[in-house]
Structures are given as structure tokens and as C-alpha cells.
Curated annotation (Swiss-Prot):
Major localization class: secreted
Subcellular localization(s) per the UniProt record: Secreted
Cellular component aspect of the GO annotation: extracellular region
Descriptive protein name: Dermaseptin-B8
Signal peptide: 1-22
Any single GO BP term: defense response to bacterium
Tissue expression profile of the protein: Expressed by the skin glands.
S-S pairs: none
InterPro entries: Dermaseptin_dom (IPR022731), Frog_antimicrobial_propeptide (IPR004275), FSAP (IPR016322)
Stretches the record annotates as Disordered: 24-46
Propeptide feature: residues: 23-43, 76-77
Pfam family, one: FSAP_sig_propep
Record function comment: Has antimicrobial activity.
Length: 77
């Protein structure tokens, strides 16, 4: 009976150890995924700001060109 008791405790102990190792690995994987998501978000934010700046520059140039065309048309009359 003592042999079975020791065996059972050993199995339970090893099960708990392996479970804690699995949970630790799972946490590490989640941390890595979160870090990758953060990096991707930063890249998207950087890309979006560049697109936004390019759009502003294009609108400014188009506005100046339209204003110049209108002033030329008014000047011709």
C-alpha cells in the first residue's frame, strides 16, 4: 500500500511540474505574440502617418494649383 501511495504522489507531482512548465511556455508564447502585435501596430501607425502627410501635401499642391488657375482666369477677364 505504501508503494502505491508513493507512486501516486510521484505521478501527481510530475503532473503538476509538467503542467506548470506548459503554462510558463504558454505565457511566453502569448508575450511574444503580444510583442509582435505591438510591433505591427507601430508599423501601421508609421505607415498611416506617412500616407496622411503625403495626402496633405497633395491636397495643398492641388489647392494652390486650383487657386492659381482661378486667379489666372479672373485676371484674363
Amino acid at each position: 500500500m505504501a508503494f502505491l501511495k508513493k507512486s501516486l504522489f510521484l505521478v501527481l507531482f510530475l503532473g503538476l511540474v509538467s503542467l506548470s512548465i506548459c503554462e510558463e511556455e504558454k505565457r511566453e508564447n502569448e508575450d511574444e505574440e503580444e510583442q509582435e502585435d505591438d510591433e505591427q501596430s507601430e508599423m501601421k501607425r508609421g505607415l498611416w502617418s506617412k500616407i496622411k502627410e503625403a495626402g496633405k501635401a497633395a491636397l495643398t499642391a492641388a489647392g494652390k494649383a486650383a487657386l492659381g488657375a482661378v486667379s489666372d482666369a479672373v485676371g484674363e477677364q
